[in-house]
């Protein structure tokens, strides 16, 4: 979806200039497995789970069409992390009973939001990617939402706006099969249900696999390589650092780069209570 939109916008970008602002969110009601809830095993909470995706796609769409994935230079990161729903005693107990993870002792964030600022090295133009992620989206299921704003043009995506919808009444609800076959993290089995007709393509798996195979066949590195993944990880850690210190993290500072190299967030150390409560 995003890749196709960028290809369609290429002629517009050539005439008007690249996107200046990207806003991305990925939200659902919480992970399936206990280890994903445990910050000491997963490395954090929703920021390290899904914030990495939102930061990555923001960087991608802000990059001028035809440029490498790391063309834009990350300049700064500003973020906050919070424990909202799953910090309430009632829901902490539910999580402990269901997953065996005690957020009274080792909590992780269930909400994060932030801004990454990038600079175009050719024009010095600054552009921004805003990200928002949560583990408390209890609507229909997993939602991916994004929009991009450029001079004179824009795009918008919402994965729950499906061309296919199903309605299941109360009498038929007991006969409904596993609703996750229709939508990941589905939270309902009756009413008006959204159906994602091609999740593998929506989440980028098809493009990534095709690029990996094509790259391997000609002996070149993939479009999204190890160094790119390491940079996304660094941006996530900078977001945790920003939330902990309550200030913008400037990635152009040498001391900051040195600190990030061995940085481990308090949340990932099991000390989230120091910053979330």
How should these model regions be labeled?
Residues 84-124, 144-227, 231, 249, ...:
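C-terminal glycine/acidic-rich active-site capping loop/insertion
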Residues 11-14, 232-241:
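C-terminal hydrophobic helical "lid"/dimerization subdomain
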Residues 32-141, 227:
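Rossmann-like dinucleotide-binding domain that binds NAD(P)(H)
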Residues 51-55, 209, 233-236:
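Short, hydrophobic/amphipathic alpha-helical packing segments
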Residues 6, 62, 66, 209-220, ...:
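Short, hydrophobic alpha-helical segments
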Residues 23-25, 80, 149:
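Alpha/beta-hydrolase-fold catalytic nucleophile elbow
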């Amino acid at each position: 979806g995003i890749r196709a939109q960028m290809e369609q916008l290429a002629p517009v970008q050539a005439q008007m200039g690249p996107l200046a602002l990207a806003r991305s969110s990925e939200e659902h009601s919480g992970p399936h497995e206990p280890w994903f809830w445990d910050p000491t095993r997963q490395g954090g909470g929703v920021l390290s789970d899904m914030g990495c995706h939102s930061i990555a796609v923001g960087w991608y769409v802000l990059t001028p069409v035809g440029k490498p994935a790391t063309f834009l230079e990350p300049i700064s990161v500003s973020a906050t992390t919070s424990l909202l729903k799953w910090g309430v005693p009632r829901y902490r107990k539910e999580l402990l009973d269901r997953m065996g993870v005690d957020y009274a002792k080792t909590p992780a964030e269930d909400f994060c939001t932030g801004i990454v600022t990038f600079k175009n090295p050719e024009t010095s133009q600054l552009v921004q990617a805003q990200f928002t992620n949560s583990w408390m989206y209890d609507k229909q299921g997993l939602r991916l939402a994004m929009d991009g704003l450029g001079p004179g043009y824009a795009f918008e995506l919402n994965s729950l706006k499906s061309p296919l919808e199903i309605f299941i009444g109360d009498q038929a609800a007991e006969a409904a099969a596993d609703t996750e076959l229709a939508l990941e993290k589905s939270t309902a089995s009756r009413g008006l249900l959204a159906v994602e007709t091609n999740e593998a393509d929506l989440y980028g798996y098809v493009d990534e696999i095709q690029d990996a195979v094509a790259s391997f066949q000609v002996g070149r590195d993939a479009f999204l390589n190890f160094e790119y993944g390491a940079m996304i990880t660094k941006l996530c850690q900078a977001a945790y650092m920003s939330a902990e210190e309550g200030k913008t993290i400037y990635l152009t500072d040498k001391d900051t780069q040195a600190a990030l190299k061995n940085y481990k967030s308090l949340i990932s150390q099991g000390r989230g209570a120091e910053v979330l409560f």
